[in-house]
């Protein structure tokens, strides 16, 4: 049986580790956490092997320039330094490659990036915008090879999303995939924590992303329409809800 490959991507603070852990609970899948190379190809006994990388601080659509270095970032000459030896385009050359991108509401992702990630607004916003741009580009260029998952929808509808993932990867769904939160290496919890969604709304924080970053905001909304497990309410219902 020829091995299949998987790349899980998303901006920092958007649920990449949770998603990767849930997927890796499947008995036929093994996912490495933020490996810089292709060590996943050395894994044995699994149908699907993969890696999880964050955009844009760990991986970009194209391989970084040889001139790019961490020093450039420290000096303010580069926004990010991609630690990955390989680009997303490099991953796309692997046989039977699938890409799963996770997206999170921008205000929440940026707020978490500032609080937990200790980034400035500018830095956290850039990471979210760039991840959205790349995931959107991938859905346009490689629609059959890319699946998009919403962090909020994953938390509220974990089984439905894992069923989507399993179907996308052409494997049988397993209930053990729902055990992901327990095995999350950084933030273990007994189950899905719905307190992590819509935090900015609860705190009445609005960064006006549609005005500051209109392109990324529009792309996010397009991506969101691709990853709902339940129908989106009509505009009037959302207004009255």
Predicted regions and their residues:
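PAPS-dependent sulfotransferases, especially Golgi type II membrane carbohydrate sulfotransferases
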Residues: 1-7, 167, 171-241
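PAPS-dependent sulfotransferase catalytic core
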Residues: 1-72, 183-192, 199
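Generic detection of long, well-ordered alpha-helical segments
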Residues: 13, 125, 155, 159, ...
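Residue-level detector of alpha-helix boundaries and kinks
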Residues: 14, 119-120, 150, 205-208
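Alpha-helix C-terminal capping segments
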Residues: 23, 38-44, 91, 139-142, ...
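A local structural micro-motif
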Residues: 31-32, 147, 174, 235
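PAPS-dependent sulfotransferase catalytic domain
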Residues: 50, 54-176, 191-200
């Amino acid at each position: 049986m020829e091995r299949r490959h998987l790349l899980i991507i998303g901006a920092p603070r958007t649920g990449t580790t949770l998603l990767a852990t849930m997927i890796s609970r499947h008995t036929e899948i093994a996912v490495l956490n933020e490996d810089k190379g292709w060590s996943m190809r050395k894994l044995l006994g699994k149908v699907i092997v993969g890696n999880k990388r964050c955009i844009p601080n760990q991986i970009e659509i194209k391989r970084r320039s040889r001139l790019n270095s961490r020093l450039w970032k420290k000096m303010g000459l580069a926004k990010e330094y991609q630690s990955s030896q390989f680009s997303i385009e490099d991953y796309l050359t692997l046989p039977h490659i699938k890409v799963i991108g996770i997206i999170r509401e921008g205000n929440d992702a940026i707020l978490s990036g500032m609080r937990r990630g200790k980034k400035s607004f500018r830095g956290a916003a850039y990471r979210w915008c760039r991840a959205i741009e790349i995931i959107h580009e991938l859905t346009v260029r490689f629609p059959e090879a890319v699946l998009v998952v919403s962090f909020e929808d994953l938390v509220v509808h974990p089984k439905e999303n894992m069923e989507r993932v399993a179907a996308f990867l052409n494997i049988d769904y397993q209930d053990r995939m729902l055990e992901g939160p327990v095995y999350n290496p950084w933030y273990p919890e007994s189950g899905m924590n719905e307190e992590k969604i819509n935090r900015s709304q609860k705190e009445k924080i609005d960064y006006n992303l549609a005005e500051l970053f209109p392109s990324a905001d529009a792309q996010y909304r397009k991506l969101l329409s691709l990853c709902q497990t339940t129908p989106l309410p009509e505009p009037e219902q959302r207004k009255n809800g």
